[in-house]
Structures are given as C-alpha cells and as structure tokens.
Amino acid sequence: MKSFTKYTLYLLFAAFVVASCTKEAEVGILPVISGLENEYIATVNQTLELKPIVQEAPNATYSWLLNGVEESTRPTYIFKAPSVAGQHTLVFRASSSSGIAQKVISIEVGKFTPVSASVNVILPLERPAAFPETAEINWSVTKASSDLYRLGFSEADEPLFIAAKAGRYNVKAFAGDLEFEYLVLARAGETVQTPYISNVFDYLPAPGQFVNKLPQYAEGDTHEDMVAKTAANLVGGNPTMITLGGWGGYVTFGFDHTITNVSGKRDFRVLGNAFGANANPRPDAPFGGSCEPGIIMVAYDKNKNGKPDDDEWYEIKGSGNLTAENEAWYEMAVTNKNDVRTFRDYEMTYYRPVTEEKDKPGTINSPSNFATIHKYIRWTDNKGQEGYKIKNVFHNQTYYPAWVKDDKITYKGIRLADNGIDESGQGSYYVLYAFRYGYVDNYPNIHDNSAIDIDWAITKDGKPANLPGIDFVKVYNGVDKENGWLGEASTEVAGAHDLHMLGISIDTIKE
C-alpha cells in the first residue's frame, strides 16, 4: 500500500512538470523589435530604408502595412514617399510561434527638406540649389513650435538659424516664383547644457580697493592662477562676486552653448551688486544708489574654435554709450559740475604705486578723514588729464594687481559720464545714479533693466550687428569716479545666466 501511494505521487509530480514545461513552450517569449523610430519625416519622392532588429523570434514571419494595406513580407522595407504631402501610418509586425509584436510608425511627407539641429547651436542653411546664382533670396520662419528662435545672417549673408527650445521650425526661402522650405527639427544635444557661465578666459582688474581681495590674491599667484580663481567664483549656478576695480578693469567669460538672440526679448543677464539708496535727501530723485555700470561686449564663435577672438567682439549699446543727455539725472550732474562727457576712444594708464606707507592713519567711518595715502596710484589718460587715486582706511592691501609684473597698465574703451553726486553736500552721502539700460551692476539683479537684449549689439561703425546669438561676454568698468570715503566706482560681477534656459521672459526696450 505504501509503495502504491509513493508511485502515484511520483506520476502526479511528473505530470505537473511536463504540463509546466508544455505551458512555458506554448507561451514562450514575444519577439522584441528595435531599430525603428516612432516618427519619420520625409520630403516628397524621398525613399526611406527601414531596417528593424527583431530578437527572440526564431523562424519569424514579417508584415509591413502602409495605411492598413500590406505592402511587404520582407524583414526590411523601403518607403517611397509620394509626390504629394501627407501623413502616413506604417505598421511593422513580427510573428513567431510564441506570439506577435508590432511597431506603429508615423511618417510625415512634405514639400520640404528636413534637417536636424541641436538646441542652442547655430545651424547654417544652404542656398537652395534650384535657385539661380543671381536670385535675390528672402528667408522667413513660417511656422514654429516656439517663439524662442532666431533667423539671422552671417557677414557673407548666409542664413543662420538657432532655436532655444526643442521643436519643429519651418524656414522658407523665396526668390520670385521659386520657393524652398527647410523643416528644422531642433532636439536637445547629447551633452547637458547649463544656463550659467562655464568658462573664464581672462581677468585683469584696474587698480581699486577690492583688487587682490575679490578674488583673493596669494603670494606668488600668476595671471593664470588669478583667472582660475575668478573661474572658481563665477562658473556654475552658485557664483560669488569678483571686482573689476577702477575704469577699464575687465573679465571675459563664456557659456557652454550659444545664447539665442530672440527677437523682442532680453536674452541674458550679468549679475552685479547694485542697489538703490534708501535715504536719498533729493525729492523725486531717479533711481540711484550704488550703480557702477560695466560696459558689455559680446561675441559668437564664428570659427568654432571655442574661444573669443579679437575680430568677433561687438559692443552692447547701452543707453549712455554715445551720450548721457537722455538720462534722467543728466541735468542734475551738470548742475553738480560732474564731468558728463562720454569718450568712445578713451585710454587710461595706471602706474604702480611708489609706496604703500601711509601719509596718515585715517579714521574709520569718517567722511573727512578717510584717506591714508593721498597720492597713491598715479594715472594719465589720452585726453591730457592726470592725477592720483587715493588709498582709504578701509583696505590696507595694495590696490594694484599684485600678479602684474609691469609697472604700468593701460586700458582702452568707452568712458561713460560721471553718474555720482554727493547728495549730502558734505561728502557723507554719495548717490550713483543708474543709466536706463544696457549695463552690468547698474540695476539690482531682480530688475528687468539688468537684463540684456543681444539686439542692442552694434558693429564698429554703429550699425546693428544682427547676431544670431552669443557665446562669449566681456565686461569692463565704464566709469572713472572717486566717491569720497566710499572709494572708486568699481563694477562687480557675480555670475551670469541665459534667460531663455531659465524660462525668464522679459520684453526688450525699444526707443
């Protein structure tokens, strides 16, 4: 009896194992299809060869259905686009003994030439081959997934397209009765882009009270060391401040992508530390406080060498780059006997100080006794002027860039009108008034007027530059102003960002 029971149990177990194996064989593993996109775009009369990869499907059979009609049973398929535009659905099926897998594909056919582009990368568009060489071609964007794009032109009149957002952009060329259309498919690139500064190329502040402190100089540091320290402060999303010192001091930096010049919008912002006065005694005064405007130069990487070249720079035409006469504070400055001239060809030379020994100790928080060396750093300019920069009681380090071996440094550029007024009349309350737009460290970072429109860029002869975008920025201090016990007006830079990548939309200023 026990032997019979044991034999019966053995048969039941064997039957279960066989049944399980049979069930697994019946179910199997479904075919796996790869190597096909969900969507394809083709121009009329174009052919597309589709080569799917089918796995886990020995002895499989295949079927291609175009718009519901079987067209082929081969493992590959050639789609022949018709001569008219339209939308098509293609289904690929792979069948095996274990089941059926399928891939549904959408194919758009149009009278255009599809081209792929990466977001925030300039795409040159070729002249249509069918157009006569003498034809005058007009280009326009006829349809766009987003407003964040630019269709511009090179100096050789080559069309250049760039999009700040992924999507589809239809770009048409017209010449008389002739038409040609590109469908630009902008996609995110393989590398992750950041809206912030990614590289610092150069740094040379002019003498000033924060020089050798922001960033901190250490004995033996070279120019390369100070550029690296500047990069450590400015690169990335958590920047810290650097100083440009007195007039002419500069920093040059870049981004890991081209910032798109979107029509009608501000495109980027360079951060400073400007703020408004909270106790200005002047009634109904225009905005002012600590406004130390830095002039902006921009460039895009024409030759794709990854660095700014001397022939690529364009001036951002701020509101006071030609004259300050339209600034709200201009008449106030004239009455105050400020030097309100604007020099577009200014040169200033600073000389290494002869001594760091104090004339007198000076007194902290004393507007009348702040100077420790009155004839500290000698300067001359190309307008026949000369004088000395004062050393104050608040900062004891040398104001001359300590890593510079030369005994003099010359800077060149635009010198803006003097925007600072002692509103106390006693040397105790200086207000530096803001220019209307177009500068760094001129308005608080949260204010729209701290944002920059690339369309403000001009050529050397003052014409609009019409840049498609920019890769590099240079900022230099645009004012030469001593403000009593506050010291010199010194542009500070505390980072920069691409407004479009951050989703910040600010309309431009139109005059």
Which positions does each model-derived feature cover?
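Solvent-exposed loop segments of extracellular immunoglobulin-like
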Residues: E56-S63, A135-W139, K143
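A domain-level signal for the mature, folded cores of soluble proteins
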Residues: L185-G294, E312, K317-E511
